[in-house]
Amino acid sequence: METDVVIVGAGPAGIFTALEMRKRGSRQRILIVEKGLAVEDRRCPKNITGRCVNCKPYCYITTGFSGAGAFSDGKLSLSYEVGGDLPSLIGERKAQETIDYTDSIYLSFGADGTVEGINNSEAVKEIRRRAIRAGLKLVDCPIRHLGTEKAQDIYYAIEQYLLEHDVEILFGHACTNLILENGVCRGVIVDSGKTTFDVKAKHVVVATGRRGADWLESICAEHGIAHQPGTVDIGVRVEVRNEVMETVNEVLYESKLIGYPQPFRNKVRTFCQNPGGFVSQENYDNDLAVVNGHAYKEKKSPNTNLAILCSHNFNVPFDQPIAYA
């Protein structure tokens, strides 16, 4: 099988690669290889059974079109000050322009036009004063809440757009290896579950996300591809009654707080706050289960949950921080 561009993984990075190519008028043949299902076919049995049934071969929440994002809290943080290391790679101004552009794409596919955390400046000042007294920094960050259920509708619209614009997507197909010739990637090896075949391509984009991080690390090691361990966030998810977080929920929707507590003074931050949300379970390889938070636009709980995370960059005494976490 041959194509012009093969993209491994139909998470946000893979999706937006194909989307941007089509929006810019590219007529190159694009193939996305995704081991999970189409977004409309992803259904977590726990919603019916009340318990995790350990779906095989993959968890429906973590794999499939749009990745874990289809079942997350569905929030867009609209400030370059929040998130990964993009500002250090391309600069703060370009990072903010990219965020704004990405936000406009979500809006074009039906995202809610409401932005949280930009009004009621006096109430924000009071929350900031309380944070300072507690030794914390409150980061200003506008939030667009898509909603867990609405995010799935938006990603379905994006999926249909790609299919209508001649992007081929192989669902239920796993990339098992890269095809390298004289140090150049010329394609990928794909397993359909019944057969294995090669896909030759002029360009290969590997966008496997967290779900494929271990696989990608092993591929890099096998082929001698230089790579560097990324940041690991280790922490807990906390759930409290809505009344405890009422002011923050109503004024900001999500608070972005940063602290450097004793004794180690490592950076600790709040993340993924879900007013009226639900704590969820996600399963990965080797029977690893972690928790996430969902926040629906319509269905609400009496609780608020959020993560408290400590970020680490390290490679001594080991160089597999994700496995350690």
Regions found by a protein language model. Name each.
Residues 96-119, 123-138, 307-308:
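Internal alpha/beta core interface subdomains
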Residues 1-83, 124-325:
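Residues forming the flavin
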